[in-house]
């Protein structure tokens, strides 16, 4: 006979707010842009609810001189014009134009190896900061001034702590020097775009704290972004927050997160751990997070086909995986501009986070039941307007056998104590969302 479960009390206080959410989204490869990709884009936008798109056009940062044989002459304006009018670049411009039409300003990024003549004799370490910055600024300048695209922010470097093939090697001490040159060259072009940095592989504050020691960069840095493919400790989160604190207006994003399983045989496990990691980020003050990857595809930077995508890529179709449905439990309902609120849970095996719109007429709870047994939740909402307390919550759930299924509508106020709040039964090992729908 199934277990009856235990009662778990959850208290949400509308008067105690934390960070504002910038959004959730995906890393996306624009080389795949073609008409048959449109159904996948529509899924990401209209069903998943992704609003952040970290878009890489070339896959490598050596686009002026892939073979490294031309040298500095490869940055000649005529040559760069030809590259930016070429097929690969045009796929990027068209994907961004499509996103702009859908109300999205993408996060333009660059990753992978740079031209070899920009490197030290070791063939790994970036040393020609001036020409590297010239190359990066030319990309942003073309996108904004020649293509007329709206771009939210720009990320010039990727995982410089591990280097090739993810990007050139740059020490934490040298990183701010590159940013100062980029800032100068962007300013000379009249480009007031925020930078996203440092996008490091290792989760620590080593590079962030050195960037934040340069007050001249405070107006240029819009986001401090980190990467996550494993569980992160509270001490690590504390370190990153402390490192970023001198730049209070720079938000924290997880520029890449997911799991590195490539077997394709652990999809429910991957969906589960990705959700727990996302909750960790949000509990620790992150304003946004982007899954690696939007869909299964070939990546130029490491020259491999990968299956990290939320969507499985088929011959003529893109199919949502379990990790897509788990992500949807958060992405679709917690919208940009929502604030995280205090949510206290009486048992540690149930995790719950609460979010509300600025006027608090929309409220969302997301969580997981980490127990293998069902739990009876009673959720009390304190300090919300009457339009909420007299309304109902839609209950959505993802489990090993469910895919963000709509389970029920539940009144915000119950009949009597101890069932006076939102009264919901959550099975073991499941992800749940309660979304106010009037």
Give the role of each language-model region.
Residues 413-438:
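C-terminal beta-strand-rich structural cap/linker in extracellular carbohydrate-active enzymes
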Residues 1-43:
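N-terminal module-boundary/linker segments of secreted carbohydrate-active enzymes
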Residues 20-28, 49-59, 105-110, 152-156, ...:
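Structural recognition of the beta-strand scaffold that forms the well-ordered cores
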Residues 11-15, 47-217:
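Substrate-binding cleft and catalytic face of glycoside hydrolase catalytic domains
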């Amino acid at each position: 006979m199934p277990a009856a479960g235990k009662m778990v009390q959850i208290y949400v206080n509308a008067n105690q707010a934390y960070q504002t959410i910038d959004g959730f989204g995906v890393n996306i490869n624009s080389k795949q842009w073609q008409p048959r990709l449109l159904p996948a884009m529509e899924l990401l936008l209209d069903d998943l609810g992704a609003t952040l798109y970290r878009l890489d056009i070339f896959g490598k940062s050596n686009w002026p001189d892939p073979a490294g044989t031309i040298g500095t002459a490869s940055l000649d304006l005529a040559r760069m014009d030809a590259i930016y009018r070429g097929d690969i670049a045009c796929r990027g411009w068209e994907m961004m134009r499509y996103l702009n039409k859908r109300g999205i300003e993408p996060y333009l990024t660059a990753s992978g190896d740079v031209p070899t003549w920009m490197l030290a004799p070791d063939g790994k370490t970036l040393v020609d900061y001036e020409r590297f910055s010239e190359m990066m600024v030319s990309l942003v300048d073309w996108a904004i001034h020649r293509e007329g695209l709206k771009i939210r922010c720009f990320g010039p470097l990727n995982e410089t702590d591990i280097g090739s093939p993810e990007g050139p090697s740059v020490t934490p001490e040298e990183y701010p020097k590159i940013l100062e040159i980029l800032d100068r060259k962007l300013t000379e072009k009249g480009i007031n775009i925020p930078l996203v940095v440092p996008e490091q592989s290792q989760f620590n504050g080593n590079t962030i704290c050195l960037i934040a020691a340069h007050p001249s960069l405070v107006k240029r840095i819009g986001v401090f972004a980190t990467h996550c493919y494993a569980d992160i400790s509270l001490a690590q989160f504390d370190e990153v927050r402390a490192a970023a604190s001198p730049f209070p207006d720079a938000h924290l994003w997880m520029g890449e997160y997911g799991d590195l399983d490539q077997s394709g045989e652990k999809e429910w496990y991957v969906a589960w751990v990705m959700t727990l990691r996302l909750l960790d980020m949000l509990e620790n003050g992150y304003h946004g997070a982007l899954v690696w990857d939007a869909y299964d595809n070939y990546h130029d930077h490491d020259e491999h086909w990968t299956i990290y995508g939320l969507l499985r890529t088929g011959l003529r179709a893109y199919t949502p995986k379990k990790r897509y449905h788990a992500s949807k439990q958060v992405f679709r309902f917690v919208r940009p501009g929502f604030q995280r609120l205090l949510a206290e849970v009486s048992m540690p095996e149930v995790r719950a986070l609460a979010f509300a719109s600025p006027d608090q007429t929309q409220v969302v709870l997301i969580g997981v039941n980490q127990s293998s047994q069902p739990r009876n939740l009673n959720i009390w909402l304190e300090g919300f307007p009457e339009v909420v307390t007299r309304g109902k919550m839609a209950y959505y759930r993802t489990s090993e056998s469910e895919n963000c299924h709509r389970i029920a509508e539940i009144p915000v106020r119950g009949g009597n104590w101890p069932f006076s709040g939102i009264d919901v039964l959550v099975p073991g090992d499941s992800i749940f969302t309660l979304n106010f729908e009037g």
